[in-house]
Amino acid sequence: ELGFTRARGPEAATEWYNFEALTTPLDHPAADEQDTLYLEGGGLLRSHTSPVQVRTLQNPQPPIRILAPGWVYRRDTYDATHTPAFLQVEGLVVDEGVSFVDFKATLAEFARRLWGPGTQVRFRPSFFPFTEPSAEVDVKRVITLPDGSTRETDWLEIMGAGMVDPNVLEAAGVDSERYTGFAFGMGPGRIAMLKYGVTDLRTFFENDVRFLNQFTGPSGPVGPASESTGVPSPEARHRGGGELR
């Protein structure tokens, strides 16, 4: 309904697509081997889906309005909020006259469609190498508890976003004097954690059907998802406290 189409790209990338085309120098900490998974013989596993944005900018000329979902890879520990491989969705809008007002209105509409019309949205100044200005997007919403009562959540960060740096447009061959745009990125796993009250990201990877079956309906659980499925928690299992049989 918002006019986006899906775009995909390879999970293996060059340093240019993953970093340099996005105004991230190769001496940036994100490009270090401690954070990025490099391949023998050259190349790397993409650490975000932003290379899809660059490839899209190189091919069809604006207007562009895409969502780029896919797996990304980082040298992260496997814990309650991080995994070394995870899904990411990035969005890109580029056209003549795209402004910061368009940026805020689109992302606010996205949040309200996902969590309901009463969702509050705020934008906090931030920094990303490939957007300027940049912002973190937070939401606050009212949730229904198991006993039927309601309460307002704290502010929760859901994505990073910003206006596309003109240098990114120029690197891909797009006239930055004529076109402007914005980009945003989020992790569906963390979005699901916020939406359904899941506290441990690893639960989604444990293949416990008693947990996963809660999401088989058209819209998932009516209320917070239950992680109390009668099996040891992911934290306990990774401490050697039990295993699924």
Give each language-model segment a name.
Residues 235-245:
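Long, low-complexity, intrinsically disordered segments
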